[in-house]
Amino acid sequence: MIFYNSLSGKKEEFKPIEPNKIKMYVCGITVYDDCHIGHARTNIAFDVINRYFKYRGFDVTFVRNITDIDDKIIKRANENGETTDKLVERTIKSMHDAFDKLNILRPTKEPRATQTIPEMIAMIETLVEKGFAYQGTNGDVFYRVAKFADYGKLSKQNLEALEQGSRVDVVEEKENPMDFVLWKMAKEGEPAWDSPWGAGRPGWHIECSAMSKKLLGDTFDIHAGGSDLRFPHHENEIAQSEACNECTFANYWLHSGMVKVNAEKMSKSLNNFFTINEVIEEYHPEVIRYFLASTVYRSEINYSKENLDNARASVERLFNALRDIEPVEVNLPDDASEYEEKFIKAMDNDFNTPEALAVLFSLAKEINTLKTVNKYKASGYAFLLRKLCDVLGILFTDIEEYFKQGDGIDVSEIEKLIAERTQAKKDKNYARADEIRNDLQNQGIILEDSATGTTWKKG
């Protein structure tokens, strides 16, 4: 298995620290607002990778943190006139609900920053003792970037150039403009914890260093996150952790590509910013997940109606292949292993989901060909298709339920119209019955009458 390591800037063969075990840390969200489509992209990317590791037989400890104390959280809570605790709990529930809808597995462990304060303080104390941190004139504790010789090794940036670029941002309480905060002194009305430097709260970067150390150890296999976190967040994590622990922080670094909207950067100022729940109002979660998983994880992905409509068509092709066929493992044909080997070859090469999906569509084509001539063999291929779809986390909805739910379709309204049509037929009002059938057909809903009643599906 090889994948791109952001630290080395090239593809490398993956060698876990412990055989058959993987320890992986993914930077989670700062819980001050509902998750947006960019969060979905990052978390689906690493969910697919997590699922693939498990499929390949690894025992995965997958840690995804929650940043539950931050300037943004405090600001939003004040704007809402509520406590930070109330905002945090509501936002975490919203996150879980959205991720569950997208079939994102819950992490093995989901630490909160506020539950790891003692470990953060201990790390900062060690950094101060070793000369990597100091207390500024305003009481805040800062990391002394110039003392860490390898600063910039992840983002491939030169410290001297960074320092020159930040001269305009000179802050008197710091020795160097590049120094970043480890501990912030308390402000009136803000959450605070006691520390050797006075009451305050941690800086963002030390939170992840402490949480990963607590749950995965000083050195672990994989650290991952969105490409926007590579600098300064991940660079600062390395500086803190390696100075404190005197060993490699993470052996492999994975970064997911950003979401663009109609080829533009997604941002609230451009009014092209969408929450997960807003997108689900227009597209089924199956479609959203397929769309976000269909591009190689480290590439940018373009969010557009055209691309989502194409994803919907692809999802329906896969579902249609599994329609009217019962997946049966014992019926696996002898040549089924060839499909699985191609799938593994694709995913073993930097988690190449487009190539993996091409294998699934080849399987779907085979199933469709065999349905009417060899249902036994078709059911074996259907089992394999289901199995491999599960590795990517797609086709998680019941087939008939998917076609009933559709996109933006009001199921209760359809059922109501079917009941009205049934009554119209009983009343011999065939004109009204035909009108209802035609109206639904124009919406892409096909009615099927039988002796037991009327069923419907998307056309």
Curated annotation (Swiss-Prot):
Its cofactor is Zn(2+). Binds 1 zinc ion per subunit. Belongs to the class-I aminoacyl-tRNA synthetase family. The lineage of its organism: Bacteria, Pseudomonadati, Pseudomonadota, Gammaproteobacteria, Thiotrichales. Zn(2+) binds at residues 27, 208, 233, 237. Its main location: cytoplasm. NCBIfam families: cysS. One of its GO terms (cellular component) is cytosol. Gene3D superfamilies: Cysteine-tRNA ligase, C-terminal anti-codon recognition domain (1.20.120.1910), HUPs (3.40.50.620). It is found in: Cytoplasm. HAMAP family: Cys_tRNA_synth. This is Cysteine--tRNA ligase. Signal peptide: none annotated. It comes from Francisella philomiragia subsp. philomiragia (strain ATCC 25017 / CCUG 19701 / FSC 153 / O#319-036). Its EC number is 6.1.1.16. Monomer. ATP binds at residue 268. Disulfide bonds: none annotated. It holds the Pfam family tRNA-synt_1e. Keywords: Aminoacyl-tRNA synthetase, ATP-binding, Cytoplasm, Ligase, Metal-binding, Nucleotide-binding, Protein biosynthesis, Zinc. A motif ('HIGH' region) lies at residues 29-39. It catalyses: tRNA(Cys) + L-cysteine + ATP = L-cysteinyl-tRNA(Cys) + AMP + diphosphate. One of its GO terms (biological process) is cysteinyl-tRNA aminoacylation.
